[in-house]
Amino acid sequence: MAERANLVFHNKEIDGTAIKRLISRLIDHFGMGYTSHILDQIKTLGFHQATTTSISLGIEDLLTIPSKGWLVQDAEQQSFLLEKHYYYGAVHAVEKLRQSVEIWYATSEYLKQEMNSNFRITDPSNPVYLMSFSGARGNASQVHQLVGMRGLMADPQGQMIDLPIQSNLREGLSLTEYIISCYGARKGVVDTAVRTADAGYLTRRLVEVVQHIIVRRRDCGTIQGISVSPQNGMTEKLFVQTLIGRVLADDIYIGSRCIASRNQDIGIGLVNRFITAFRAQPFRAQPIYIRTPFTCRSTSWICQLCYGRSPTHGDLVELGEAVGIIAGQSIGEPGTQLTLRTFHTGGVFTGGTADLIRSPSNGKIQFNEDLVHPTRTRHGQPAFLCYIDLHVTIQSQDILHSVNIPLKSLILVQNDQYVESEQVIAEIRAGMSTLHFKEKVQKHIYSESDGEMHWSTDVYHAPEYQYGNLRRLPKTSHLWILSVSMCRSSIASFSLHKDQDQMNTYSFSVDGRYIFDFSMANDQVSHRLLDTFGKKDREILDYLTPDRIVSNGHWNCFYPSILQDNSDLLAKKRRNRFVVPLQYHQEQEKERISCLGISMEIPFMGVLRRNTIFAYFDDPRYRKDKRGSGIVKFRYRTLEEEYRTQEEEYRTREEEYRTREEEYRTREEDSEDEYESPENKYRTREGEGEYEILEDEYRTLEDEYETLEDEYGILEDEYRTLEKDSEEEYGSLENKYRTREGEGEYEILEEDSEEEYGSSEDGSEKEYGTLEEDSEEDSEEDSEDEYGSPEENSILKKEGFIEHRGTKEFSLKYQKEVDRFFFILQELHILPRSSSLKVLDNSIIGVDTQLTKNTRSRLGGLVRVKRKKSHTELKIFSGDIHFPEEADKILGGSLIPPEREKKDSKESKKRKNWVYVQRKKILKSKEKYFVSVRPAVAYEMDEGRNLATLFPQDLLQEEDNLQLRLVNFISHENSKLTQRIYHTNSQFVRTCLVVNWEQEEKEGARASLVEVRTNDLIRDFLRIELVKSTISYTRRRYDRTSVGLIPNNRLDRNNTNSFYSKAKIQSLSQHQEVIGTLLNRNKEYPSLMILLASNCSRIGLFKNSKYPNAVKESNPRIPIRDIFGLLGVIVPSISNFSSSYYLLTHNQILLKKYLFLDNLKQTFQVLQGLKYSLIDENKRISNFDSNIMLEPFHLNWHFLHHDSWEETLAIIHLGQFICENLCLFKSHIKKSGQIFIVNMDSFVLRAAKPYLATIGATVHGHYGKILYKGDRLVTFIYEKSRSSDITQGLPKVEQIFEARSIDSLSPNLERRIEDWNERIPRILGVPWGFLIGAELTIAQSRISLVNKIQKVYRSQGVQIHNRHIEIIIRQVTSKVRVSEDGMSNVFLPGELIGLLRAERAGRALDESIYYRAILLGITRASLNTQSFISEASFQETARVLAKAALRGRIDWLKGLKENVVLGGIIPVGTGFQKFVHRSPQDKNLYFEIQKKNLFASEMRDILFLHTELVSSDSDVTNNFYETSETPFTPIYTI
């Protein structure tokens, strides 16, 4: 009893780790037997206490944490701020997601810490606390879910849901929270079911790969080791764990005193000495080299010293111990537990979030400002960075708190600031690993409301989607969604105008989706847009009367996609640019072109690339009929012949034009007589289908035959342009036409050329020489305009077009052109392979015959069926069928011109149309064939009229050496079937104006509409300038920094890019409007908006009954003296208050400048009627049926105070975007929006929502596109940390063991390898460099694999000794593959052999064997052992045994498994003795001899000195060889 009284009584709770320590010390002091008795008493004590306490868990024991309320409130406050920043457009969606996830994660973690202290203080004997924190049941994170908050959840894809579950399970979840939390629960249930089997299988594979590893020797004699040093950022705990139980590979000195010798095993005493030495001299201490299983030089076993101490009892491991199996089981066993752990966050955080330090009380905070450095947090908020550990004091009323902040932390408050209790004052940087694997993730942002899209920066077109509607942002900027409400009502619900206001014509916006709908089945256009001549005084204009389209009101339209068809099926329509059709002049009135024809493409604030198509003209006559598909055929002509025949042709041409008009009218009857076939219902394209629409154009056709020419151009990117300089391809056939070879059934056709049409101009000069009306500068370039320049066409899609390989000199002789092409109707159905056809091959059918169950024919004629592998093609050829008597006289594939009788047919009347003759063989007979005669529609290609009349040629001539040239494109391949696309007209030919420039270094040109203001005149120009040379006078959109004033003489230069330099009379129609259909705005531009003639200013509308379309030019520079305000108030002209007229001024219900001339005022009275209509001074009533109305709640009025009017003038201009909370004048702006109306005392904002988008984000849709709620708006690509725990626990470990690639490579891996390759030769001298480099790489990869596996286990709270993992990794990495380049006599190329075995064979043979190290997975390593019995018992038994038999393999029964299978004694434990026949003397002798080798020791010094680079275990010194094992067990048999 006396003894017991003297003992110290530790009144302290004891947890799992304390018990572990106690047991290990008991074993050290008393040995195993005695310890077990002591532990037995502890067990009895524990059971006794537990029974008397009788702990049970009730719901009352779950105490909620008092601080939870304000913590959650704090987090919500931060989230709310974040939401507001997002709403203002200050942060983008990805930032918002990241920050909100971090806010909630930090809150949840802090709550977890609070929970511990709360239990400890309030109720230390609480059963929940006792169970979870003693480690008996449950862990902190589970208790946290019960009493704290459940926190963030991951969705099934592993993405975080940024809505955290704020309740805990004790309080109960709401419905939403419950559903969110079901994701993780479901995953957990599935994992438990699926992975338990996986875990067992993992153990089996691990044991399989290392079952033969047994401790067989005391020492293998290696001199290598792995360096361990606490300087590498290793924590002390880890350092101790790594060292204890290992054996030193080298002596250790402190100063000159040796404190430990080689081959000594390391105990706790020695480790403590190391630690004190390191602390005393942290920089002078050398790293400690230890032996590991990696460095063991044995092949299929391991020695005692490389393994170290046995973990069970603290001595060196005994000989004959099966350490391999122990290792496999140690790693596999925790796997069964890991399967049951699915963390509630899905483990998305891999240490990226920081720990927070909160203030202990209210008070003033103070710290030394010299020790901190201003910086920003990763979210951009200002903060201070500590250089060293910082001491912070917080002074409250009566007490001084001090807080220590570790180095590299961020302080989030300022010195001397007042902080509240629990306010976050600092953020501790989490130790980020250097190799943090990131993955690229896309995040789509969807529009939150209906609206139209605007952006405030230039955009690039993503190169691979040249014709799509995706754009990449070159810099961070805002996208705006301007609010609209979609309502189709005939009653305008809201107007901003008072009675008698001045306003623009038709300033209500109209949704363009409903306007040009040419795709309707009847050939009427459903919207008459504007009738420009007031026939009667009170004509009512209605938007929706199905009526003829009015052609001579010169109006402009955006987007050809509207003009031709509005079908959403055609995604390839080029919506990527603004297309502005040009207007034309009174002078050119006789050359009347469809006003829909010419369009300019301007990428809005965009960049034109080299050779971009800048404008194009689609002639309406080159449109394919909507009703059918068919084949296009071309002919080429030579120029010489053309000159010869031009005169006669011109005369015949004229007559032909005379008859063309009747032909249009009589085409329908004609076609019936002409082709007696059911096909006549399908009018050919030249029929009235199209001309009905454009009736107005052709009403005056008789007077205009000379100019009804064709121009042509590109359509979709699939098609190929023809080569113009095609002499290489087609030779110079002078009198022949050839079409290209078709699809096999068309032969090449030849025919005479008498009936060829030439150009309709009188002189050949006009076509091929200079143009008379052209401006002078242009003439020398013009020949190039016709025929293209060398790199004309490179913008088109790579595979689709043939490049022009033109030369600079154009020789007339060989220049060929396609002079006409033919469209032959033919129907094609591509049917699934399985479909059953209701018609036979080669049968003749009528229109609307049923082909398959649900398709019917649209043409009648001959049916041809081709069965392909994947589908069936069914073609229907329309036309007559003849059976000729004489076989020889008909050439197959001919095109027969009109006016010629066909010899073999019985018809005698003359044809008016071309026909296409095809020979078809009758099946099973060689001679017999029939001829199908198919109608062909001929389209003439006349190059005669240059586009000079369409595209003014002096356009952009001077500026920056831009060149424009004409390129003509045919849109379809020769003889290629064009598919019918529903409700569309295919354009066959398109003429394009291509922009190019000479400077090679300039990649792109910037096209924009510039508004130039001098004094009070506003002019708009189209500016194309090379990038990098922005001219200062251009006022960028909504950019108020650059003032748009330029000297007057800039405008007076003659070569200003005026659109019509010759126009002395500016022809203005009575209503000259721009109607931006798809862009939801109509505006009226009194002057030509694109390029204004240099001598005209902006002129208002003229009401002049005599000259409705002409204005005599008075003094063009009328100063604009006064401005009418919105209510007709005259405002003195203020120079910096002017409306900006861009091409796209948004919803032009804006202040307007008027000239002060009596007859220029245009006033509208607003009728207060049920149906909204407007009456102007001429008493014309206009009705609206507006599809997008502005509703009152989308507009916000802001009233300015008179005193602040002066300053705000500089700030506000129309169209400017304003973010919410901007302080313009005394009050804040309450909502984001765009300035829409400016009054004297107020302005109106149109509500808008800004979205911040970063560089490289992809914008979906074009400028001004109408978006509906939920449409995809923008896609971000961002990097996020690869979540290391979605594949958490077991699967992750398994992936590493199986050597599957799980991570992307480290971003800086390449640089590291380069550095390494530079340093190695420098350190070791050149000759050894790469040999050692390769060895060290293997060593380094082994170490990093071990670290990876340990990281996963540690993250799950499982402790496994490194040695076990090392043994497995050694097996996985110890194989090499013999490579082909050094053919050795010993091994086959591609064979897998052990690394040491390869080295030995190399030494024995004195020849080098080339091999490369490979990483085998554990399964493959199990199937590549030296024992085929072991392999066969693992997998693929029959295959393994058969292979072994064929090779004659011998199994030496080294491992355990082989012996178990055959029933022998296993060679471990006592059975091990029979393998050992060696005396210890030999071994010692061997080492003494080897140590005398001087070279070896020098080499070792080199290696050990420099292994800080990477921990090395290189085996360079080939002088060492290992004596083979006992004579009766040869290991290798080849």
Swiss-Prot record:
GO annotation (BP), single: DNA-templated transcription
Biased composition (Basic and acidic residues): 644-668, 678-688
Entry keyword annotation includes 4Fe-4S: no
Requisite cofactors: Zn(2+)
Disulfide cross-links: none
Enzyme Commission designation: 2.7.7.6
Keyword Transcription included in the entry's annotation: yes
Class of the enzyme per the UniProt entry, highest EC level: transferase
Compositionally skewed regions (Acidic residues) per UniProt: 744-762, 770-789
Single GO MF annotation: DNA-directed RNA polymerase activity
GO cellular component: chloroplast; DNA-directed RNA polymerase complex; mitochondrion
Subcellular location: Plastid, Chloroplast
Catalysed reactions listed for this entry: RNA(n) + a ribonucleoside 5'-triphosphate = RNA(n+1) + diphosphate
Cofactor binding, per record: Binds 1 Zn(2+) ion per subunit.
Keyword annotations: Chloroplast, DNA-directed RNA polymerase, Metal-binding, Nucleotidyltransferase, Plastid, Transcription, Transferase, Zinc
Subunit structure comment from the entry: In plastids the minimal PEP RNA polymerase catalytic core is composed of four subunits: alpha, beta, beta', and beta''. When a (nuclear-encoded) sigma factor is associated with the core the holoenzyme is formed, which can initiate transcription.
Described function: DNA-dependent RNA polymerase catalyzes the transcription of DNA into RNA using the four ribonucleoside triphosphates as substrates.
Family designation: Belongs to the RNA polymerase beta' chain family. RpoC2 subfamily.
Entry protein name: DNA-directed RNA polymerase subunit beta''
Protein's organism: Saccharum officinarum (Sugarcane)
Gene from which the chain derives: rpoC2
